[in-house]
Amino acid sequence: MAIVGIGTDIVEIGRIEAVVSRSGDRLARRILSPDEWRQYQQHNQLVRFLAKRFAVKEAASKALGTGIRDGLAFTQFEVCNDALGKPSLRLFDQAVVLANRLGVTGMHVTLADERHYACATVIFER
């Protein structure tokens, strides 16, 4: 397998907290898929949940080589977790088109968070 894209993003959790304080759920609705939105509403650490999802989606958009633009939206990426909490990624719409163009057959996601930051790396391979 060959790496066809890699992206990393780091998010200052305090910045996400400030946006949520100012605008309520607007940011969450802009970046979360419907399934993520349901999880978000039941989560006990809303800001941390949102910051981690944001970091993964930014990293994934960078791995596709585009960033969030030209028809690519945060909601076209969905972060899922297995029973042990290991993150994975589902793609929709334009994200699928771009991944297919690159010949993506495998995806890897790593996610870390500490007190002030959330960091994610996404690798696409073929």
Curated annotation (Swiss-Prot):
Alphabetic keyword roster: Cytoplasm, Fatty acid biosynthesis, Fatty acid metabolism, Lipid biosynthesis, Lipid metabolism, Magnesium, Metal-binding, Transferase
Transferase listed as a keyword: yes
Cellular component terms (Gene Ontology): cytoplasm
Main localization, broad class: cytoplasm
A single BP term in Gene Ontology: fatty acid biosynthetic process
Localization, UniProt: Cytoplasm
Entry binding sites for Mg(2+): 9, 58
Reaction equations catalysed: apo-[ACP] + CoA = holo-[ACP] + adenosine 3',5'-bisphosphate + H(+)
Essential cofactor(s): Mg(2+)
Keyword ATP-binding attributed: no
Molecular function via GO: holo-[acyl-carrier-protein] synthase activity; magnesium ion binding
SUPFAM superfamilies: 4'-phosphopantetheinyl transferase
EC number(s) on file: 2.7.8.7
Role this protein plays: Transfers the 4'-phosphopantetheine moiety from coenzyme A to a Ser of acyl-carrier-protein.
Stated family: Belongs to the P-Pant transferase superfamily. AcpS family.
Protein name per UniProt: Holo-[acyl-carrier-protein] synthase
Organism: Sodalis glossinidius (strain morsitans)
